[in-house]
Amino acid sequence: MEKTYNPTSIEQDLYKTWEEQGYFKPHGDTSKDAYSIMIPPPNVTGSLHMGHAFQDTIMDTLIRCQRMKGKNTLWQVGTDHAGIATQMVVERKIAAEEGKTKHDYGRDAFIDKIWEWKAESGGTITKQLRRLGASVDWDRERFTMDDGFYKAVQEVFVRLYKDDLIYRGKRLVNWDPKLHTAISDLEVENKETKGHMWHFRYPLADGVKTADGKDYIVVATTRPETMLGDTGVAVNPEDPRYKDLIGKEIILPIVGRRIPIVGDEHADMEKGTGCVKITPAHDFNDYEVGKRHQLPMINILTFDANIRDAAEVFNSNGEASNAYGTEIPAKYQGMERFAARKAIVAEFEELGLLQEIKDHDLTVPYGDRGGVVIEPMLTDQWYVRAGILAKPAVEAVENGDIQFVPKQYENMYFSWMRDIQDWCISRQLWWGHRIPAWYDEQGNVFVGRNEEEVRAENNIAADVALRQDDDVLDTWFSSALWTFGTLGWPEKTPELKVFHPTDVLVTGFDIIFFWVARMIMMTMHFCKDEDGKAQVPFKTVYVTGLIRDENGDKMSKSKGNVLDPIDMIDGIDLESLVAKRTGNMMQPQLAAKIEKNTRKTFENGIEAYGTDSLRFTLAAMASTGRDINWDMKRLEGYRNFCNKLWNASRYVLMNTEEQDCGFAAGAELEYSLADKWIESQFELAAKEFNGHIDNFRLDMAANTLYEFIWNQFCDWYLELTKPVLWKGTEAQQRATRRTLITVLEKTLRLAHPVIPYITETIWQSVKPLVDGVEGDTIMLQALPQYDVANFNQEALDDIEWVKAFITSIRNLRAEYDINPGKPLEVMLKAANEQDAARIEANKPVLVSLAKLESIRVLADGEATPACATALVGKSELMIPMAGLIDKDAELDRLAKEIAKTQGEIARIEGKLGNEGFVAKAPEAVITKEREKLAGYQEALVKLEQQKATIAAL
């Protein structure tokens, strides 16, 4: 092994070997249990971010554990075609490079252009996955536009349509006026902004008056432009001010339309004026009110969000209606929506109908891709009747067929699913799964897998023109089929039989509804087991938190706080990091601030930490369901952990290579107490690690590895072996060498799922030295399980006592500033015979590691000189202090330390006693100051105790 651990020199070559040797594939033995995970398909346009790295580390750890347990494991990888995102990338590319739009190309040629782009640039994220050590079966890589998956999508759509679970209807959707498509709620970014609330007077019709004698009511709105489409005003039926007006009408200003006053609890008596204008075609809440009261819907906006030349009028079911005229005042026709807002407010003012304007904090919806304000828009779209599909999906979680980890997310799932609305699945894009529906010239719709099937099933002659629907399916529709569509469904493939249902889905809470719930609905509707029972897509949903920056802020390009996992693996210099964070920004005005913060946070750029350090950090921070504040210091700490494992392994190899390790038949072996202890500690670690993995507590599993490797194996066991290897008998040395190499080999196997590269590299050097270990790779070795035969409680208890004894000596040396190399005379006032026996049995180790001149057990009642003392269990350890220290110099040193500590206490108490500081400082800063104060106060008590002890000498 190389003297120092250098991840750069081993990782990529090692991964290439793993992949070429086919170690990631299922072993295919169907007599063994199967285990499968489907990677949530990242967007093909994307690159690896910290969230991916986090979830992929979790999945790879789970998969490697199960593979090492002998299971037939499949971790299937793939990417999503990402409709809007991909289309925008290619549209921007042809605009920048060729000055063309998609319309210059035409649909088919533009789609060819996207396929070209995918071939050239679409594999970035899968290349990066390899850098993370992801042991996915690359031969089964899938894409949501693959021929096989396309066939599954078409099949699902056709069957749902024939089951009357898909229909085409006119409903309200999130409309992106820039991209000209409906978008999902997840693609809407709500931004807090300062705005206004306009209070308009709406005149009452037919001479009606309010309870206080006014001939108008006042409505409050943040969107004056939509009043052109008002079809009602809602008041609360319990509101004494207005309840007598229910059933009356108002004359809508500007357009002169008579519209009813309806009683509806949507109107809040305590909010605004208590009167709410209802615009069913341009507000989601109003749409529901309109349906309840069968109000007409008037669409006043074009797809560009300009005012139409003539309104569209529909009844509450979305059918064309003549309930109202379509006239829009000429001055507003074609006007941009926000210009219309100003003009309408001005006209209300001219008419004397603008009562007041109030400042108002608004939440405004923006499209996360197009970047413009989203409009609720009445459009013809395709919908899934989700309520019918949701019922069995709810029951699957209620009865435990699917479990959420942490369990609290079940409530989030239930709250969505029990109030589910029909799902809009069509998008006005070119890139995606085109909807398999055709129209004749009369507007009749025909659904089938292809045009030939449509003509055959419906007896449509070849000379009758058919036009395919221009829309494509929402990407969430196709990705809802991910667990079964990628395994060959609708064919009954062997893979589908073996690997479905999958075992675990690792995902974020933000897509429980958009993806997780829809996968459950679709899978249970289409996949049945041999007994005809609906299959679930996965047995467990492991919900992770978000990775945030060190301050707890969400990572985003606009904040300039994004960390690239690859930069932490390979390192990046400061100038490159600044350029990366400030380049291609949507808001270039933020660049200077981002540069300043980056230079402050990363003065020297980012070091290369290697993949294993990153993976271990991510695992160690994976507390289920909680958001994680990224901490570069922990990454540095776990890089040190990898170095510690490397150096410990070199020590083991230096003491075992070309040595007698006791594997020969009949070899005499005399195991030390420490040998038995480390075997027992390992068994406990294996038991804990497996339990934590089974419970999805990767943070605790990583902590178990850290505690065992760093604290037990490296810090204690290796030290405890030195007296044996230097001065022990041949039988003792043989046994210790055998223990060193076998425990290291088992430890490497236990740690491998979390830190695969370093463990494989070391294992290749260790393997030849351990009898009975065969195979070319550690990843196909057995994951260690608890073995009671190797567990010795007495050895555990005895070595814990030995550790406490040595630690107490070291602590006393530090407290009294005794030279760490000076041999000490130590006495023990033993509490029982067991402790006296422990001294006798372990004297060579105690003398060596605690650096003692002598050690003896005191007789009962024996007088002792002035000593420094410590408790070890129930016994008292004593170090005679005469001649060990310069009493006057030590008292002088302690006096200075005490004065310094008292000064710090006074300073912090003054700070915390300052009302201005406490009122203005963040809670975290105040907490930190209080913690510092407690630390200084504790230190002061110890210093004064030491001073008293030394003064008595």
From Swiss-Prot:
An annotated GO BP: valyl-tRNA aminoacylation
One GO cellular component term noted in the UniProt record for this chain: cytosol
Top-level class of the enzyme under EC nomenclature: ligase
Location of the motif 'HIGH' region: 42-52
Signal peptide span: none
Gene Ontology MF annotations: aminoacyl-tRNA deacylase activity; ATP binding; valine-tRNA ligase activity
Superkingdom of origin: Bacteria
Keywords: Aminoacyl-tRNA synthetase, ATP-binding, Coiled coil, Cytoplasm, Ligase, Nucleotide-binding, Protein biosynthesis
InterPro entries, alphabetized: aa-tRNA-synth_I_CS, aa-tRNA-synth_Ia, Anticodon_Ia_Val, M/V/L/I-tRNA-synth_anticd-bd, Rossmann-like_a/b/a_fold, tRNA-bd_arm, tRNAsynth_Ia_anticodon-bd, Val-tRNA_synth_C_sf
Pfam family, one: tRNA-synt_1
Motif ('KMSKS' region): 554-558
CDD domains in UniProt: Anticodon_Ia_Val, ValRS_core
Chemical reaction(s) catalysed: tRNA(Val) + L-valine + ATP = L-valyl-tRNA(Val) + AMP + diphosphate
Coiled coil stretches, renumbered: 884-952
Alphabetical list of Gene3D superfamilies matching this protein: HUPs (3.40.50.620), Isoleucyl-tRNA Synthetase, Domain 1 (1.10.730.10), Valyl-tRNA synthetase, C-terminal domain (1.10.287.380), Valyl/Leucyl/Isoleucyl-tRNA synthetase, editing domain (3.90.740.10)
Its EC number(s): 6.1.1.9
Primary localization class, coarse: cytoplasm
UniProt comment concerning the protein's domains: ValRS has two distinct active sites: one for aminoacylation and one for editing. The misactivated threonine is translocated from the active site to the editing site.
Functional description taken from the UniProt entry: Catalyzes the attachment of valine to tRNA(Val). As ValRS can inadvertently accommodate and process structurally similar amino acids such as threonine, to avoid such errors, it has a 'posttransfer' editing activity that hydrolyzes mischarged Thr-tRNA(Val) in a tRNA-dependent manner.
Description of how the protein assembles with itself and partners: Monomer.
NCBIfam families associated with the record: PRK05729.1 (NF004349), valS (TIGR00422)
Name of the protein in question: Valine--tRNA ligase
Upper classification of the organism: Bacteria, Pseudomonadati, Pseudomonadota, Gammaproteobacteria, Vibrionales
